[in-house]
Amino acid sequence: MKLHILKSKIHNAIVTSGDLEYEGSITIDNELLEMVDMIPNEKVLVVNNNNGERFETYIIKGAHGSREIQLNGAAARCALVGDEIIIMTFALMDEAEARNYKPMVLIVDKENNPKSRHHVGEQDEPLS
């Protein structure tokens, strides 16, 4: 049996823009993606801390260092510019692997600058 396990998350990101006319997705600064091992086209679950909305979409790579978090298409209706969100990826694992896996968490500040990074259950690695 395979289990859906949290793989990584970007915590407390701020939505910087939205584009209703785009086909769909979430554009994320590539530097942030690399820091938590997320990749373009990967499915994400997004939680809006301001209104409780949860939605799924997929990642588009944004410009490295831009600090961009842009919601596109229908996803742009789920959060406003300035809303705080959590972006999560998941992986399928067998139970033995899942019991030992430690997801990577990247915490960002109000400008989406990386503050710290850690595996769940381990000490923060300060980044600024």
From Swiss-Prot:
Listed pathway(s): Cofactor biosynthesis; (R)-pantothenate biosynthesis; beta-alanine from L-aspartate: step 1/1
Top-level EC class as recorded in UniProt: lyase
Binding of substrate, residues: 57, 73-75
First-listed, main subcellular location of the protein, grouped into a coarse class: cytoplasm
Annotated GO biological process: alanine biosynthetic process; pantothenate biosynthetic process
Record-annotated active site: 25, 58
UniProt-listed Pfam families: Asp_decarbox (PF02261)
Family of the protein in this entry: Belongs to the PanD family.
Function comment: Catalyzes the pyruvoyl-dependent decarboxylation of aspartate to produce beta-alanine.
Protein name (database record): Aspartate 1-decarboxylase
Native source organism of the sequence: Pelodictyon phaeoclathratiforme (strain DSM 5477 / BU-1)
